[in-house]
């Protein structure tokens, strides 16, 4: 102390871990904390010792978990919630006119996008990011499970609930942070991982890219160039767009897939009910068998990405085999529920987040592989009018191949209705193709009653979509009676 002036606490300290990571920031508020990506980051920061609060328009499983951990969550948005905060984190679903965002800006509290906060967490660990239009959540979950089985104790932030952990996120003591890299709003450009996988590149979220697929593709290239020159890009060579990327990436590349020229090659795939067996052949001649507790070719590719990443991080083959064989799954990713009791017999029930034609097709193929002799009854809730319009013909083509179909109105996700892109129009297009004859449901409330008159013993029900349909399986678990619904 000189002249009576006390020394200040250092803004940054070394080593930069725990609460020292963010300097003097101690109190962080999350606007829209109930989202899977938001809640996971909030949980990790809470476990690091930060004071976390949040708000959302409604409660839910993520909010309930956080409250159980001691996080204060308010239902509804109010400027008072950000008073005294050092930072405010927002998801892309939160608009600038949100009263908490406006109050934070007026008080000069930093307003931080969710992906930027994830990037800050990643900066002080070895970040491993999984990108791609489809398969991010499953691949990230499989990788986290492999690292955990290999005793690397990873931190992970996942868009789905890892059933074995009962959470979307976990703070580990190990050096690796595994997370999804979200291209839907181009926010993955905030991330600068050490390693990154790209599972596929498909036409989705084109509104973010001005309707230009090439702009989406260029953004993936930009993301991969956020890797350091000594990093690694792990690419699915089976995907034609990812194959195109390979020659434009100025970083070390490792490829995987069923293709003959893959560095990590999948062969000998065999379906066995809900499980799948296959072999992995590596470029140095090493080969080993894998049994995966998930069905479907798409999940084998997801597992191959996780294997390629885990092997590069030093996880031994035995640990990988144990992790994939015992993997308990992720919420809403081919999640198998108890059978639905019927008046006579029962029907199997599977729930999945699939909301893009390519995802629907992969999920249906997996179900047919698991239950080749059984009738598939699909309940599909389209997600967003814009996506339904952009991919209308593909949706109609895939859905017309179902055995029986209940199609609901589009889950708007805040969008205005678009003429010719609603649920009725899609049902009509499916009907015109001459395959499945869809039953249209104006709302999800009608679905249990419709299923009561449709289902028969030994059917397999698939509830599919990214919106509110995720709550339907719980309604069906009590059984169905003709005319009475669930």
From Swiss-Prot:
Reaction it catalyzes: UDP-N-acetyl-alpha-D-muramate + L-alanine + ATP = UDP-N-acetyl-alpha-D-muramoyl-L-alanine + ADP + phosphate + H(+)
EC annotation from Swiss-Prot or TrEMBL: 6.3.2.8
Identification of the protein by name: UDP-N-acetylmuramate--L-alanine ligase
Principal subcellular localisation of the protein: cytoplasm
Species of origin: Halorhodospira halophila (strain DSM 244 / SL1) (Ectothiorhodospira halophila (strain DSM 244 / SL1))
Biological processes per GO annotation: cell division; cell wall organization; peptidoglycan biosynthetic process; regulation of cell shape
One Pfam family matching this protein: Mur_ligase_M
Gene3D superfamilies: Mur ligase, C-terminal domain, Mur-like, catalytic domain, NAD(P)-binding Rossmann-like Domain
Top-tier EC class: ligase
């Amino acid at each position: 102390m000189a002249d009576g002036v006390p020394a200040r606490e250092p803004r940054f300290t070394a080593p930069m871990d725990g609460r020292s990571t963010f300097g003097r920031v101690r109190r962080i508020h999350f606007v829209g904390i109930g989202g899977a990506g938001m809640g996971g980051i909030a949980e990790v920061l809470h476990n690091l010792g930060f004071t976390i609060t949040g708000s959302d328009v409604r409660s839910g499983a993520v909010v309930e978990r956080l409250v159980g951990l001691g996080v204060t969550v308010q239902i509804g948005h109010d400027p008072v919630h950000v008073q005294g905060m050092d930072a405010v984190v927002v998801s892309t679903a939160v608009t600038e006119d949100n009263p908490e965002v406006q109050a934070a800006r007026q008080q000069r509290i930093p307003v931080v996008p969710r992906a930027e906060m994830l990037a800050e967490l990643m900066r002080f660990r070895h970040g491993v990011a999984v990108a791609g239009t489809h398969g991010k959540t499953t691949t990230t979950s499989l990788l986290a499970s492999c690292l955990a089985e290999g005793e690397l104790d990873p931190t992970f932030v996942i868009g789905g609930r890892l059933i074995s952990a009962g959470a979307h996120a976990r703070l580990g003591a190990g050096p690796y942070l595994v997370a999804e890299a979200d291209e839907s709003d181009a926010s993955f450009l905030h991330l600068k991982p050490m390693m990154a996988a790209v599972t596929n590149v498909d036409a989705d979220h084109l509104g973010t890219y001005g309707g230009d697929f090439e702009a989406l593709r260029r953004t993936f290239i930009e993301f991969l160039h956020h890797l350091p020159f000594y990093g690694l890009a792990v690419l699915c060579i089976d995907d034609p767009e990812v194959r195109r990327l390979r020659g434009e990436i100025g970083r070390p590349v490792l490829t995987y897939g069923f293709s003959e020229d893959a560095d990590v090659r999948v062969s000998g795939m065999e379906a066995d009910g809900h499980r799948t067996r296959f072999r992995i052949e590596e470029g140095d001649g090493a080969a080993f068998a894998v049994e995966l507790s998930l069905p479907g070719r798409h999940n084998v590719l997801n597992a191959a990405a996780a294997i390629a990443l885990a092997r590069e991080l030093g996880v031994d083959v035995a640990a990988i085999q144990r992790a994939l064989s015992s993997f308990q799954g992720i919420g809403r990713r081919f999640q198998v529920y108890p059978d639905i009791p019927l008046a006579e017999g029962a029907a199997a029930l599977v729930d999945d987040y699939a909301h893009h034609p390519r995802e629907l097709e992969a999920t249906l193929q997996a179900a047919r592989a698991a239950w080749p002799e059984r009738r598939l009854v699909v309940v599909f809730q389209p997600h967003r009018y814009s996506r339904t319009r952009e991919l209308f013909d593909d949706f109609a083509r895939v859905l017309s191949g179902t055995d029986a179909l209940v199609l609901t109105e589009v889950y708007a996700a805040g969008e205005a209705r678009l003429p010719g892109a609603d649920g009725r129009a899609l049902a009509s297009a499916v009907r015109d193709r001459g395959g499945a004859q869809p039953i249209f449901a104006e709302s999800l409330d009608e679905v249990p009653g419709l299923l009561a008159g449709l289902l028969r013993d030994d059917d397999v029900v698939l509830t599919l979509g990214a919106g509110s349909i995720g709550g339907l399986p719980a309604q069906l678990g009590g059984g169905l009676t003709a005319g009475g619904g669930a």
